[in-house]
Amino acid sequence: MTYLEIEGTNHLSGNVTISGAKNAALPLIVSSILAKNEVKINNVPNVADIKTLISLLENLGAKVNFQNNSALLNTNTLNQTIAKYDIVRKMRASILTLGPLLARFGHCEVSLPGGCAIGQRPIDLHLLALEKMGANIQIKQGYVVASGNLKGNEILFDKITVTGSENIIMAAALAKGKTKLLNVAKEPEVVQLCEVLKDAGLEIKGIGTDELEIYGTDGELLEFKEFSVIPDRIEAGTYLCAGAITNSKITLDKVNATHLSAVLAKLHQMGFETLIAEDSITLLPAKEIKPVEIMTSEYPGFPTDMQAQFMALALKANGTSIIDERLFENRFMHVSELLRMGADIKLNGHIATIVGGKELNAADVMATDLRASSALILAALAAKGTSKVHRIYHLDRGYENLEEKFKGLGAKITRLEE
């Protein structure tokens, strides 16, 4: 098993280039199932989740060439509609293949998903929507078995669901007639999926709002154009927090500041200033790091995927911070590990109270999921001594070239084998 050794209390400086968004690239790669032509996608991050999805598509018969952050996908060779457990169990985003496979072939079997261990994240909203479009759905031996010719309908999502929205948008693309989706997720990753499908010839109205109208092609495949994945706002937020927790001046390149409004607002409340250019953000050190109150919510609110990183940052604040996690249960699994480093954090249900300003000490800690693991790295950067972060395969699922990027900023971080 590999682990990271991190020497704390060093200042950071310099520039870091932000990768393409994993959570945008996943549905965009899957959307190639809807294509009649070979699809070229640029700025694809080279992370474990992407490789898992590519192996799933190859398992279904697609031809994929992935190198230098570009993916060339040909799904004309698809000859299989069963997404097997062996691959799907590694990553819950595999469920995204359900809508497009069903829409294209009229039947598919997709194993129930795995991935991060953060709460239930049920797929019932996906299944209810597909049933409303005429699908016959059964759960058999751990697989979603779906069949039927999809027809447009009006669908109201009971809760905002990002993967649910993406799945049904792709299903509606090849369905017969108009689909109206209400209470759709507005995340930038969902918006890019819609824009790419529109550029591929799909008639779609309301992009960027919570109401979409999609005029399905009745099985006719789409003609995709070459495109690039948007920058990863969560990776960007993580590096901003790294600069903040070490109270350093750093610059992020190839980033979209408009996708980070909620994160930047909280950094400003904590006393940090930022300089925003067209595709860069510079974080300036704070005279005093102030406590903050955060409540997670759907975009454009504060992202749940940045909650753990801000909890680490709040440990350096002069006072008591509150984090209210509204989206997922089990999203405080990093707390017990932060306590090992001397953190003062109290949990009451979905609310965490963080008393900042106490010295953090290096420790051996264990990553439990993707974002929690980044919080441990941030805490290690601020702790006195040398920490070891174990089970970093969680990090490799979502952060590209993590230690190289941190080393480029001056962090003392090494990947080692146990």
Curated annotation (Swiss-Prot):
<feature type="binding site">
    <location>
        <begin position="22"/>
        <end position="23"/>
    </location>
    <ligand>
        <name>phosphoenolpyruvate</name>
    </ligand>
</feature>
<dbReference type="GO" id="GO:0008360">
    <property type="term" value="P:regulation of cell shape"/>
</dbReference>
<feature type="modified residue" description="2-(S-cysteinyl)pyruvic acid O-phosphothioketal">
    <location>
        <position position="116"/>
    </location>
</feature>
<dbReference type="GO" id="GO:0009252">
    <property type="term" value="P:peptidoglycan biosynthetic process"/>
</dbReference>
<keyword id="KW-0808">Transferase</keyword>
<keyword id="KW-0133">Cell shape</keyword>
<dbReference type="GO" id="GO:0071555">
    <property type="term" value="P:cell wall organization"/>
</dbReference>
<comment type="pathway">
    <text>Cell wall biogenesis; peptidoglycan biosynthesis.</text>
</comment>
<dbReference type="GO" id="GO:0005737">
    <property type="term" value="C:cytoplasm"/>
</dbReference>
<keyword id="KW-0131">Cell cycle</keyword>
<dbReference type="GO" id="GO:0019277">
    <property type="term" value="P:UDP-N-acetylgalactosamine biosynthetic process"/>
</dbReference>
<dbReference type="GO" id="GO:0051301">
    <property type="term" value="P:cell division"/>
</dbReference>
<comment type="similarity">
    <text>Belongs to the EPSP synthase family. MurA subfamily.</text>
</comment>
<feature type="binding site">
    <location>
        <position position="92"/>
    </location>
    <ligand>
        <name>UDP-N-acetyl-alpha-D-glucosamine</name>
    </ligand>
</feature>
<keyword id="KW-0963">Cytoplasm</keyword>
<keyword id="KW-0961">Cell wall biogenesis/degradation</keyword>
<keyword id="KW-0132">Cell division</keyword>
<dbReference type="InterPro" id="IPR001986">
    <property type="entry name" value="Enolpyruvate_Tfrase_dom"/>
</dbReference>
<dbReference type="InterPro" id="IPR005750">
    <property type="entry name" value="UDP_GlcNAc_COvinyl_MurA"/>
</dbReference>
<dbReference type="InterPro" id="IPR036968">
    <property type="entry name" value="Enolpyruvate_Tfrase_sf"/>
</dbReference>
<feature type="active site" description="Proton donor">
    <location>
        <position position="116"/>
    </location>
</feature>
<dbReference type="InterPro" id="IPR013792">
    <property type="entry name" value="RNA3'P_cycl/enolpyr_Trfase_a/b"/>
</dbReference>
<feature type="binding site">
    <location>
        <begin position="121"/>
        <end position="125"/>
    </location>
    <ligand>
        <name>UDP-N-acetyl-alpha-D-glucosamine</name>
    </ligand>
</feature>
<comment type="function">
    <text>Cell wall formation. Adds enolpyruvyl to UDP-N-acetylglucosamine.</text>
</comment>
<protein>
    <recommendedName>
        <fullName>UDP-N-acetylglucosamine 1-carboxyvinyltransferase</fullName>
        <ecNumber>2.5.1.7</ecNumber>
    </recommendedName>
</protein>
<feature type="binding site">
    <location>
        <position position="327"/>
    </location>
    <ligand>
        <name>UDP-N-acetyl-alpha-D-glucosamine</name>
    </ligand>
</feature>
<dbReference type="GO" id="GO:0008760">
    <property type="term" value="F:UDP-N-acetylglucosamine 1-carboxyvinyltransferase activity"/>
</dbReference>
<feature type="binding site">
    <location>
        <position position="305"/>
    </location>
    <ligand>
        <name>UDP-N-acetyl-alpha-D-glucosamine</name>
    </ligand>
</feature>
<keyword id="KW-0670">Pyruvate</keyword>
<dbReference type="InterPro" id="IPR050068">
    <property type="entry name" value="MurA_subfamily"/>
</dbReference>
<keyword id="KW-0573">Peptidoglycan synthesis</keyword>
<dbReference type="Pfam" id="PF00275">
    <property type="entry name" value="EPSP_synthase"/>
</dbReference>
